[in-house]
Amino acid sequence: MKSGIHPDYVETTVLCGCGASFTTRSTKQSGQITVEVCSQCHPFYTGKQKILDSGGRVARFEKRYGKRKTTADK
């Protein structure tokens, strides 16, 4: 392996949207990474089902289509 061609590997803090944080190592020089979902709030790991609404898309969908009656209800 050639020496001097690999980036530095620094200690990095990962900050989640849920407020959790943990420390890992990365080549990103800022020392901080921001993520929307981590293992402490992801439904697969927590066993809870919740809707992750980014940008209000789910609310907009429910506003448009959520209260419509089906043909069987008429």
Curated annotation (Swiss-Prot):
Cystine connections: none
Recorded GO CC terms: ribonucleoprotein complex; ribosome
Keywords, in A-Z order: Metal-binding, Ribonucleoprotein, Ribosomal protein, RNA-binding, rRNA-binding, Zinc
Annotated GO biological process: translation
UniProt xrefs under PROSITE patterns: RIBOSOMAL_L31 (PS01143)
SUPFAM superfamilies tied to this protein: L28p-like
Molecular-function annotations in GO: metal ion binding; rRNA binding; structural constituent of ribosome
Pfam families recorded: Ribosomal_L31
Cofactor dependence: Zn(2+)
Transmembrane annotation, as ranges: none
Superkingdom of source: Bacteria
NCBIfam families reported for this sequence: L31, PRK00019.1, PRK00528.1
UniProt record similarity statement: Belongs to the bacterial ribosomal protein bL31 family. Type A subfamily.
Protein's name in the database: Large ribosomal subunit protein bL31
Natural source organism: Mycolicibacterium vanbaalenii (strain DSM 7251 / JCM 13017 / BCRC 16820 / KCTC 9966 / NRRL B-24157 / PYR-1)
